[in-house]
Every structure is written in C-alpha cells, then in structure tokens.
C-alpha cells in the first residue's frame, strides 16, 4: 500500500486547484496534497483544469515542494469512452500522480489491472455512508474513501471503528443539497449530468412551496434547496481524534484567493490539533473566510441533522461579509447600522473601508442589485457609520431602508492572499538526515535519508587525510550539508562517523551533498514509477465477453425466470398499497411475466405487501433505501424478514448485507449503483446479481453499446418513470412545515401533506420522503422510452420496468396495458408515445435516452 494511504500517517490537508494560480496558492499556504482535474473525466467540467500534457509539470512542481498530487477522475465512464479513459490513465501514471479519485467501479477494475501500483481513492460520488459499503470497495482495491458530506461525527466514529480504510472528510466549501453521485436533476432537466461533471446547479434556483395543491407563503426564503457553505474549522480536533486521514477543502471552481485563505485556516487548525493545543479562529480569520466565498456558514451534517439550519434560503450565491442594514439615506451616501455579530469586535479589524466593494440586498438576489466601491467611511456611533460613494455609482433614491449591506470585495485581503503565493515558493520541504562515514586513508561516504527511511549515497575516493590544523567538526559539516537551496529538502540531523582528527575539504562535502541529494530525489521518483499493463482494457473486455456467453444465471427463487428464457418481461415498481393491489390485479389479465417491486415510504408495510402478493400467487420484490447510514441495519433486517422473492439493491452496503445472508432472495441491482459500462456491469454480475438496471445517465447510443458488450438479457431497463432528481438528507417537510430539527421533533408533516416544489417555469416537482426521512424530488414530467423498446428487444434486452409515482389504480392498469403491448410486439411504441402525450397533462419526455 502507498504511504499516501497509511492509516497511521499524519493527517493531511487536501486543497483544490482548478488552475495554476490556485495550485500555487494551495502549496504556499500549507496544503499537504492538492487535487485537480484534467480536461476530461472529472466532476468539475467548468473549471479551467489541466491538460494531460501539463500533468508532468504539475507533478514535478508539487513533488519538488514535498506536496502530493491527486487526479480527480471522478465521473461515470461510458463503454465507448473506456479506450480514451485507459489512455488518460497511462498518461497519469507516467506523469507520477500520487493517486486518482474515482467514482466508477468499472474504472476501479481497469486501474487495478492497468496500473496495480496506482492508489485509488473512492470519490464522494461513490456515496459511501456505511462500513459494509466501504469494505466492499476496499475489496476491489480502493485504498482511501471520501465520505459523503451527510455524515455526522458520530457516523464517522462508527465507521472508523468498523473499518481500517483511511477516511477523507470534507471540512470546508460548498454543500450539494443532494447526495453526491445520486443527483439526476441536471440530467433530467437538461441532459447535463452531475455524474459527468456538468452540474447545472438547479439547487441554487428559487422554488415555490406547494402544499396540498396550494401555494404556501415562505417569505423571503425562495431558495429552498440551496444550502449554506460548510465551515468546520471548529471540528478539526475531534475529527483528528477520530482518526480521519485527510481533511478536504472543496473548491476547484473557486479563486486562488479562496484557496489561499481556506488552506491557511485549516493548516493552522490541523497543526493545533496535532499539538494538542486549542484552536479558535480569530475575528479577522472568520471575516477572511467569509469574504473569500460564503453563502453563509454551517457545520453541515458533521454536528448532526438540523433541517432548520442547513438551508437559510435567502440567496444562492456568495455574499461575503454582512456589514449591517441601511437605516438612513444622506445627501451623498447611507448610514449603516452594523450587524449584531460585530458587537464588541476587535477594533483593530477594519470591517469596512474605502475601496471595499459592497452590494445592497433587498431580498431579490436573482435581479440586478445595486452596489459599488466605498469612497469614504465616517463613524457616527459605535454601531453606526456613514458610507459615501463616487458620483453615479449608487442610486440612493432607489435604496430601501432596512436592506442588508454586504461587503463583496476586500482589496486588502486580495493583496494579502496574492502575496502569500506570489513568490511562487513554499516553505514546505522534506527533512533529510545525513550520515558522513570514513576512515583515514580510505573513502568518504555521505548517506542521505528521507522521512520514510529511503536512502541514497555518494562516495569520494579520497584518501581521507589527517588534519594538520582544522579537523572536520559537526558545525562545519552542518554548514556545508545544509546548503539545500533549490532542492525540496531541508536539513535534519547530521551524524559523523569519522576519526576525530579527519579533515574533509568543503568542496568535497558540497559535491557529496549535491550527488547524494540528487540520488535521493531520483530514488523517490523511482518509487512513484509504476508498471503499466497496456493490454489491460482488452483483457478485461475479453473476460466480460466470456462471462456474457457463459452458463446462464438462474433466478434465485422460483418466482424469477431463468436467464435462458428469452421471453420478455414487464416489471412494475409501486409506491402505495393501492398501486400494488392494482398491479396484482392487472397481472391476472396478461401473459407477460414480471416482478412487482414495492418502494414504500414505510418499510414496516413490506411484510403486508409480500403476503398480499403471494396470496395471489405472484412474486414480489422489495426496494432498499438509496442511502444506509451506520445504525440503520434494522431497515434492511425488516426487508430480509419480509420473505420477498427479490430485493432491489440501491447501495453497496445493502449488497454486502444481503451477501452475508443465506441466498434466499435474488439481488437485483438498481439505478443508484451507477452502472454505465460493461466493466462495472460485469463486476456486479460476478457478485451474484441476476439483473441490473443501467445508469440513468446513458442515452440510447451509450446504452446500446453497453448492451452489445454485455449480456443484454440481464439488464432491466426502466422505460417509464418520473426521474428521481434530488435525493437528499435535507428534509423540506421538516424545514418548511415544522419547527423541528429532525424526525424526533418534526411531527412528521410528510404523513399529512402532499408537497411539490414549483420552479420559475411553473413546473411542479413532487416531493416524497422515505423511511430514513430522506427526501426525493421527482421530475414533474414522466419520461417514456416506449419508442425505444423495439430497438432494445432487437439487441437482446428482455426485462423492462414501469415505475409509478402518484398514479391511481385505474391509471396504473391503463399504463401497464400500454407498455405490455409494446413489450409483446403489438405496438411499435409510437402509438403508446402519442397516447401518453395526450393523456398526461404535462405530456411525457424521451428524457435521458434521447440523443444529444
């Protein structure tokens, strides 16, 4: 295992870099490691990023300064992209990258085969929230995992107690409202997948709250899904004590100033924790953090769930520092009453000064807001000051009294940040110890040793002479050997193993130092040099093809058909008991076989559903939650004890849980597993899954390519659904319809109200809660692949699924009738498409399968 992943190693500060300036800012301000993306296959497509051609220079820059470099390769990779991905990976290995951050499990397989020595870090896009899932990816060769941001300190403690996997935790930066790797909003609404680095940030848009069909007034809280930013510098000490290996700052799309300020802050916090010293961020430090980028700060989920605190909802963008409110207009400016948080503040810290940029917040951040540069500041009282502006910069007559004043730019901070990295240097060097050995009349050897114990040496043939006047002293040796400018090293210890009367010329010592240090640097680079198996992808593809043509995988129960049976099947997922009754009744009218899956809000009703279905002689499957946290195994136990014929697996922890049990039910992989290529599909088939649902990120051509390279008959393709867009720990029901922090005191408004979120176009997106109190926002428009079903059948697919949301029993039967005709070959799909367009008030969309 790489020393970058050792669980006993010193905790690491990991900073982001979207460009060269941010890279320098991170290094100069104390980062131990930097993560960044290349021009493709990274989850921040809009960042400047680096090219593959630049990567050797990037890694040389970092390694010369004793900093590690991790390449973010954290998107799903489609089948037709695997060849390009393999080429990128070879370049990454050859450039000396210290690790790759990966989402796609198929890509993990490829890396382990292509470059076994390259460390793989599991991206937060893997949605790892429970020890079983973490152990699953460890078995695949992942050497570190980046935990989901929705975990609390207690969750992390439980995980750390049950796995030896090194853990990485986000401690600062933007928070996604949805679980990373589980957000399909951008894909559903615009074909720009967050799993492909193209998030459209729909969570930062305004929404109206529709409760039981009526508009619910939310005041100035329009941004119902826009979380505040994470800032956990106060929690570094307990996280260090939990054994967290790496502290991660979000921000590859942010400025170098932000990277510099955040890195400084967390460097100080980590160092204080390691020294067992208390850490309190100064007032200036807090202002600097807020000024560099802030939508308001929160400890996120690290301190536990608080639905009243996570989303403030007034604005979706960085505001900077809140100065106060406008209380008076003057002939040339305004009078501001300072915000209460500045009471009793350090007078040496200037809150507002000439040259600062401000904006006036009247509660409409989506509109053009007034603002400008401050020309003069005059104190009126301890709590009030007058700000004046240049002529024409601010239309004072239009300013409303009571509006909030934010400082959006601080030139002094920008200058300080730029100075911190402007010299393009870093004090961060690695210690080197020297042993100088020799005998009179013999050779003189200098051995250099780094902090890992790696050594290199240089030798002078001598002969080593006896000093006539000035024998070599330790002081002289340290002076000559300490001349390490221009190298990544700084002098540690020096030990002399020489006769006391020996003399060595300074020129000889200098030459030995240069050669030993050069050799040590070369030895370090040699360790980073890794074997690349160029045929890895071809080998894996041959294995996948062999698996696809191997003996069929029978269903695990009598209720499931064997994969040898070519007859198409139509499955249905229901979300209410009424829909289940309708589906069971409908199955009595059709010759098509298939499973009915239950995805109920309350898993306690699963046993009732199983009994009902079995009483009517029909097989049934039960869906797990998409997320499983430590301590939630009881939810899986209820599913296991319900006696279903199949379980719809939606996370790796659930897969591992059911693999530990006797094989009583078929385990069918659902869409949250993000299967986007034949390598990941084959991985899950090898884990014993008879069927898989492909990723919703695939369009038709991409899906067809994966079907061609796999056993197409083992894919279950969802052909009708309301796309699940946001899947989030944040509960809108609790936040907006109660005063409760979490499920213990919210009063469960989700049981009493039907809620939707309405966007600026008038589209209303249904909201649902699950047993874990996690919310899913669904697309308002159903997605239909009816027209694609004949093509899928022609390519060997035979399992199709219809998912219901709020359909009535009558609508359920009618919908299943239409799709049954297409699956049975009685309709080309076009007629069904036209019928759905007519009968659905909002129509239907071809959605993700539509070619871009």
What is the meaning of each model-derived region?
Residues 50-55:
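Glycine-rich, highly charged phosphate/nucleotide-binding loops
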Residues 126-130:
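Conserved phosphate-binding/catalytic loop of the ribokinase/pfkB sugar-kinase fold
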Residues 45-49:
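Conserved non-cysteine loop/helix-boundary elements of the Radical SAM core domain that shape
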Residues 1-28, 33-43, 58-59, 65-72, ...:
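Surface-exposed amphipathic alpha-helical tracts and adjacent flexible/coil segments at the periphery
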């Amino acid at each position: 295992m790489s020393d970058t992943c050792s669980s006993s190693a010193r905790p690491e500060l990991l900073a982001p870099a979207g460009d060269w300036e941010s890279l320098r800012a991170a290094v100069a301000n104390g980062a131990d490691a930097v993560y960044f993306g290349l021009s493709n296959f990274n989850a921040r497509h809009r960042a400047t990023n680096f090219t593959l051609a630049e990567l050797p220079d990037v890694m040389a820059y970092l390694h010369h300064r004793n900093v590690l470099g991790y390449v973010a390769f954290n998107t799903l990779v489609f089948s037709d992209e695997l060849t390009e991905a393999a080429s990128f990976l070879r370049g990454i290995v050859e450039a000396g990258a210290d690790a790759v951050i990966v989402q796609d499990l198929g890509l993990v397989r490829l890396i382990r085969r292509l470059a076994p020595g390259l460390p793989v870090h599991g991206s937060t896009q893997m949605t790892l929230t429970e020890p079983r899932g973490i152990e699953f990816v460890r078995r695949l060769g992942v050497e570190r995992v980046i935990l989901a941001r929705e975990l609390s300190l207690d969750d992390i403690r439980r995980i750390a107690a049950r796995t030896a996997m090194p853990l990485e935790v986000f401690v600062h930066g933007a928070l996604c409202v949805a679980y990373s790797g589980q957000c399909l909003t951008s894909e559903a609404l615009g074909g720009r997948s967050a799993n492909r680095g193209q998030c459209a940030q729909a969570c930062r848009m305004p929404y109206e709250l529709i409760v039981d069909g009526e508009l619910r007034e939310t005041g100035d809280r329009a941004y119902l899904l826009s979380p505040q930013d994470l800032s956990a510098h106060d929690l570094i000490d307990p996280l260090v004590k939990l054994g967290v290996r790496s502290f991660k700052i979000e921000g590859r799309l942010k400025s170098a100033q932000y990277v510099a300020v955040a890195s400084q802050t967390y460097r100080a916090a980590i160092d204080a924790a390691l020294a067992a010293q208390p850490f309190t961020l100064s007032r200036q430090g807090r202002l600097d953090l807020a000024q560099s980028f802030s939508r308001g700060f929160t400890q996120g989920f690290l301190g536990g769930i608080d639905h009243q605190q996570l989303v403030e909802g007034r604005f979706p963008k960085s505001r900077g520092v809140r100065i106060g409110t406008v209380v008076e207009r003057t002939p040339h400016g305004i009078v501001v009453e300072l915000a209460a948080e500045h009471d009793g503040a350090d007078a040496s810290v200037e809150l507002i000064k000439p040259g600062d940029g401000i904006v006036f917040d009247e509660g409409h951040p989506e509109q053009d807001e007034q603002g400008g540069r401050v020309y003069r500041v005059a104190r009126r009282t301890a709590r009030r000051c007058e700000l004046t502006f240049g002529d024409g910069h601010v239309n004072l007559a239009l300013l409303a009294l009571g509006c909030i004043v934010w400082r959006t730019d601080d030139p002094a901070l920008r200058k300080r940040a730029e100075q911190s990295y402007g010299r393009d240097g870093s004090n961060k060097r690695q210690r080197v110890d020297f042993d100088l050995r020799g005998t009179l009349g013999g050779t003189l050897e200098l051995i250099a040793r780094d902090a890992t114990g790696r050594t290199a040496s240089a030798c002078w043939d001598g002969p080593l002479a006896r000093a006539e006047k000035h024998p070599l002293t330790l002081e002289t040796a340290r002076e000559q050997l300490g001349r390490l400018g221009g190298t990544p090293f700084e002098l540690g210890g020096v030990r002399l193993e020489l006769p006391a009367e020996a003399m060595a010329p300074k020129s000889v010592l200098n030459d030995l130092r240069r050669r030993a240090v050069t050799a040590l640097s070369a030895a370090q680079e040699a360790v980073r040099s890794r074997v690349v198996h160029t045929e890895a992808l071809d080998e894996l593809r041959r294995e996948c093809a062999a698996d696809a043509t191997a003996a069929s995988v029978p269903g695990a129960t009598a209720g499931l058909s064997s994969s040898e049976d070519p007859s198409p099947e139509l499955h249905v997922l229901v979300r209410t008991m009424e829909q289940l009754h309708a589906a069971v009744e409908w199955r009595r009218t059709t010759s098509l076989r298939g499973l009915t899956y239950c995805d109920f809000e309350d898993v306690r009703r699963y046993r009732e559903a199983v009994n009902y279905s079995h009483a009517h002689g029909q097989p049934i499957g039960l869906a797990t939650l998409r997320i499983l946290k430590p301590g939630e195994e009881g939810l899986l136990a209820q599913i296991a004890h319900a006696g279903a014929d199949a379980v719809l697996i939606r996370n790796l922890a659930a897969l591992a849980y059911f693999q530990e049990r006797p094989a009583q039910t078929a385990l069918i992989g659902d869409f949250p597993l993000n299967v986007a290529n034949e390598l990941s599909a084959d991985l899950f088939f090898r884990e014993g899954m008879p069927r898989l649902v492909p990723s919703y990120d695939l369009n038709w051509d991409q899906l067809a390519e994966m079907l061609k390279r796999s056993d197409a008959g083992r894919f279950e393709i969802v052909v009708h659904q309301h796309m699940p867009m946001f899947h989030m720990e944040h509960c809108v029901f609790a936040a907006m319809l109660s005063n409760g922090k979490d499920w213990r005191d919210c009063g469960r408004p989700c049981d009493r109200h039907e809620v939707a979120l309405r966007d600026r176009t008038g589209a209303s997106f249904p909201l649902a809660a699950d047993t874990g109190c996690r919310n899913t926002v669904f697309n308002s428009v159903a997605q239909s692949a009816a027209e694609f079903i004949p093509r899928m059948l022609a390519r060997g697919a035979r399992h199709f699924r219809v998912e219901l949301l709020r359909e009535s029993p009558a609508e359920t039967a009618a919908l299943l009738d239409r799709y049954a005709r297409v699956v049975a070959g009685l309709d080309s799909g076009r007629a069904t498409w036209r019928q759905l367009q007519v009968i659905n008030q909002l129509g239907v969309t071809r959605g993700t399968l539509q070619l871009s």
